[in-house]
UniProtKB/Swiss-Prot annotation:
The keyword Acetylation applies. It comes from Rattus norvegicus. Keywords: Acetylation, Lectin. One of its GO terms (biological process) is positive regulation of T cell apoptotic process. Residues 17-145 form the Galectin domain. The keyword Manganese does not apply. Erythrocytes. Transmembrane segments: none annotated. The modification N-acetylserine is found at S2. A beta-D-galactoside binds at W77, G78, P79, E80, E81, R82, S83. One of its GO terms (cellular component) is cytosol. This is Galectin-5. Monomer. May function in erythrocyte differentiation. The lineage of its organism: Eukaryota, Metazoa, Chordata, Craniata, Vertebrata.
């Protein structure tokens, strides 16, 4: 597969933010999203989309002190995953960098260089997962697809 990568800074870019993922996902493909959590943030989300479906939904919720992961197929959400190896990895008012690595069986997610979870693929046609969406209570500063 192609190792095409874009590294584009987006200073003070308004969210929601959408961009295409060239060639879709494949094992070893990584995506990086960096920004600053707003000081009054309730939640934000990073979605990897496949048409109208959401293959991977990463949703830090400050009002619940949780990082929810899920998949939405045909407008129906699956079971939420919430377990983390440590405390909430995001803080209001602080910078963050999320690294999502696509593997053959799962997504591996790291925040600020620390692994926080694996999420098994529920939508299996990885090349069709070709859109990144970032929305919610953050200032987006950098995206690499």
């Amino acid at each position: 597969m192609s190792s095409f990568s874009t590294q584009t800074p987006y200073p003070n870019l308004a969210v929601p933010f959408f961009t295409s993922i060239p060639n879709g996902l494949y094992p070893s493909k990584s995506i990086v999203i960096s920004g600053v959590v707003l000081s009054d943030a309730k939640r934000f989300q990073i979605n990897l989309r496949c048409g109208g479906d959401i293959a991977f939904h990463l949703n830090p919720r400050f009002d619940e002190n949780a990082v929810v992961r899920n998949t939405q197929i045909n407008n129906s959400w699956g079971p939420e995953e919430r377990s983390l190896p440590g405390s909430m990895p995001f803080s209001r008012g602080q910078r963050f960098s999320v690294w999502i690595l696509c593997e053959g069986h799962c997504f591996k997610v790291a925040v600020d260089g620390q692994h926080i979870c694996e999420y098994s693929h529920r939508l299996m046609n990885l090349p069709d997962i070709n859109t990144l969406e970032v929305a919610g209570d953050i200032q987006l500063t950098h995206v690499e697809t």
